[in-house]
């Protein structure tokens, strides 16, 4: 006899299957590409898209929502826009752009999205962070009080930089801006070799809109100096699209913030923000935003201020970490009154102004002391530095003024002639070859000799001052390292006596050679 099921049983089985059926509906926020022009895609749809949200095109290329209209969204393409075609489907990710962070990135060269550009293989970072984050608040900060040594005499003595400061490097092209930044990174090797893990200074170098050959030279120099092991290089070269150049400094800042927020110290170089502003101007004009002065959009100040405000010295409760920023801005014919230079000057805590005229006269680094200033760095200077550097800036300024006066050829009295002669020795002592940073203790010795032992120094011919300096520093390093070590704290009468005796004997020996 065949089993037969009545209608009620069949109905109950169907009802049970329907009630237990579980196939959740997945909703996706999608849109369709209407047009693509110069790295900007206009997309119809994406009703739930958020400003700054990351999206994916059908080809796998990423993009960021930077413009929201009634029915359309303007998306900057993070890659080759040839891979994006009209009619392609675009999907929202629900997230903003993130980059890998941590010690795993040290010694690596990455692009603005954190993807490796060297031959070091995949980066397996344990942490990722949003590239856009809020700057630390007032309560979370602490005043700058720890020095960041650059190894460059004229900067450490006259324009001191502290950890957590933002110091602008500004000047015309090809007069040593990048060299100052690189020497600062290289000098941290001496510091890092002598301190514990939490006191080390890690570095991030962000190359924006530069030639790939130039970036390769920078990376090779860092390798040769042993500085790449504590440095991450973020590259958005001239051949990269404008959105990648725009993102690069934010990505680099995020990498630096990892160290800052974990009680460590980081130095970040933005090379340079002029090209960053040009990239943002290009994007804004393509997004049809109204142009302002020099065709820059109205929010260009905010673009740089929200980046540079993330550099800070953190409070005790927040771990006492720091992020020090050295942005670089290129001027045209020394014009610091242009839009981007004035903006960045007003945001930062001081500026190091490089002058073409000084550079071509042979005074390198070509720092114009009259226009350069550090508004907070003096609080971070060592006591020994303050004692010898106080009168140096005034002496140099007086020499520059008297130098112009002496050109008229009039008779000069003895005091003016003495000031001129002292100024010539000071200028020679402040000159420094690139990629040869000097410890702060050695700088103190040289400036103490100028300020207090000029009678000894004047026995050396002007043409031999650089050789005298080189030999004297080596003499202190090899024969009297204990004296240099004492200078790392303060300078008392005993140390002054030791320096006087050492220098007097050395001058006699030097002149006899």
From Swiss-Prot:
Q: Does the keyword Ion transport apply?
A: yes
MF terms from GO for this chain are: ADP binding; ATP binding; proton-transporting ATP synthase activity, rotational mechanism
Q: Which Gene3D superfamilies match?
A: 2.40.30.20, ATP synthase alpha/beta chain, C-terminal domain, P-loop containing nucleotide triphosphate hydrolases
Keyword line: ATP synthesis, ATP-binding, Cell membrane, CF(1), Hydrogen ion transport, Ion transport, Membrane, Nucleotide-binding, Translocase, Transport
Subcellular location(s) of the protein: Cell membrane
**Feature type site, description Required for activity:** 372
Annotated EC: 7.1.2.2
Q: Entry's Pfam families?
A: ATP-synt_ab (PF00006), ATP-synt_ab_C (PF00306), ATP-synt_ab_N (PF02874)
Name the membrane topology term: Peripheral membrane protein
Catalytic reaction equation(s):
ATP + H2O + 4 H(+)(in) = ADP + phosphate + 5 H(+)(out)
Which Gene Ontology terms of cellular component type are present?
plasma membrane; proton-transporting ATP synthase complex
- What is the top EC class of this enzyme, as a single word? translocase
Q: Which PROSITE patterns match?
A: ATPASE_ALPHA_BETA (PS00152)
Q: Which domain of life is it from?
A: Bacteria
So where does ATP get bound?
171-178
Subunit field text: F-type ATPases have 2 components, CF(1) - the catalytic core - and CF(0) - the membrane proton channel. CF(1) has five subunits: alpha(3), beta(3), gamma(1), delta(1), epsilon(1). CF(0) has three main subunits: a(1), b(2) and c(9-12). The alpha and beta chains form an alternating ring which encloses part of the gamma chain. CF(1) is attached to CF(0) by a central stalk formed by the gamma and epsilon chains, while a peripheral stalk is formed by the delta and b chains.
Functionally, this protein is described as follows:
Produces ATP from ADP in the presence of a proton gradient across the membrane. The alpha chain is a regulatory subunit.
| Similarity remark | Belongs to the ATPase alpha/beta chains family.
Q: Which HAMAP family match?
A: ATP_synth_alpha_bact (MF_01346)
What NCBIfam families is this protein classified in?
atpA, PRK13343.1
Record's protein name:
ATP synthase subunit alpha
